[in-house]
Amino acid sequence: MLNMRKSHPLLKIINHSLIDLPAPSNISMWWNFGSLLGICLSLQIITGLFLAMHYTSDTLTAFSSVTHICRDVNYGWIIRYLHANGASMFFICLFLHVGRGMYYGSYNYLETWNIGVILLFTVMATAFMGYVLPWGQMSFWGATVITNLLSAIPYVGTSLVEWIWGGFSVDKATLTRFFAFHFILPFIITALVIVHLLFLHETGSNNPTGLNSNADKIPFHPYYTIKDMLGFIIMFLFLMILVLFSPDMLGDPDNYTPANPLNTPPHIKPEWYFLFAYAILRSIPNKLGGVLALILSILILILLPLLHTSAQRSLMFRPISQCLFWILVADLFTLTWIGGQPVEHPFIIIGQLASILYFLIILVLMPLAGILENKIMKV
């Protein structure tokens, strides 16, 4: 008789995805972030569900309800801070996961990569709407500034913004709909993750060399389940240190002041994981140009398969492209720093130079380096 996990209609799917899945024998810890993202998503959905039980999406009571969760609900403070800092862990894993895909040429799995980019946009939208819910100063003004960017769209812009707001300013209608979207989007993300995995399992995993590994595969369980467990432990360790010792380190102090439409904070800025895109947006004086640059800064990932000129898939044996990749990483750190700084000299010019360098490396220098490396290989 067949083993139940191999014969049962439901268990069979799980078995082929997590247990008997053939995996390359040489994948490194950089391949750990997919499963870490799954854990982060589960944590966010569970903590978010418990928060939603006590939260009220009304402008008069939203701020008080968050205070009530932290003060009066059993372990409400840890649920709230796990959710807030869990989002930061989610984005750290997400950026490392995308970086891994760029470094090792995983973008050549077109369907998997494109679904991944859609996932990135969806997660960013969800995080933005979640940031509005506590209804602090930065929540209110962040929502006002970011939604207002849509008014840069010619002809329909202003109507579109008012339609999203549900009125002539960010108010009760906006908060209610943002809460509804913030609640439903993680389930849409879960569905997209399943599609992402479905496409991945059509081709099998990439590996550090970028070569075909069909001749050398090992079962996912127990080898990579144990390896992933180590990643879970390290991530939870960092998350718990953050939550229990400095839960507000990554937040903004302005968000502990209730939203006040009559008083603008001196520096409006989003959460740290959006700062690189915010810096690119601010570096262009024109509103429409800034919005386009903001969208393109993420959408550029879709173009990576078209910009791949090298005969080799991975950067493992390509030193020139490696240098450019790490300059790009340093550039993203610079943009993140600039995004959190006030709009004044010298931050404006640094932001503009870093933004130009970001697009220049991806669109021009990396493809040229690929062509150059091909020529060197032939010599």
From Swiss-Prot:
Cofactor binding, per record: Binds 2 heme b groups non-covalently.
Location, primary (coarse class): mitochondrion
Residues given in the record as heme b b562 binding sites: H83, H182
Binding site for a ubiquinone: H201
Binding positions (heme b b566): H97, H196
rRNA processing found in the keyword field: no
Membrane-related topology note: Multi-pass membrane protein
Membrane-traversing stretches: 33-53, 77-98, 113-133, 178-198, 226-246, 288-308, 320-340, 347-367
InterPro entries tied to this protein: Cyt_b/b6_C, Cyt_b/b6_C_sf, Cyt_b/b6_N, Cytb/b6-like_sf, Cytochrome_b, Cytochrome_b_C_euk/bac, Cytochrome_b_N_euk/bac, Di-haem_cyt_TM
Note: Heme 1 (or BL or b562) is low-potential and absorbs at about 562 nm, and heme 2 (or BH or b566) is high-potential and absorbs at about 566 nm.
Family named by the database record: Belongs to the cytochrome b family.
Assembly information from the UniProt record: The cytochrome bc1 complex contains 11 subunits: 3 respiratory subunits (MT-CYB, CYC1 and UQCRFS1), 2 core proteins (UQCRC1 and UQCRC2) and 6 low-molecular weight proteins (UQCRH/QCR6, UQCRB/QCR7, UQCRQ/QCR8, UQCR10/QCR9, UQCR11/QCR10 and a cleavage product of UQCRFS1). This cytochrome bc1 complex then forms a dimer.
PANTHER family: CYTOCHROME B (PTHR19271:SF16)
Identification of the protein by name: Cytochrome b
Organism: Eospalax rothschildi
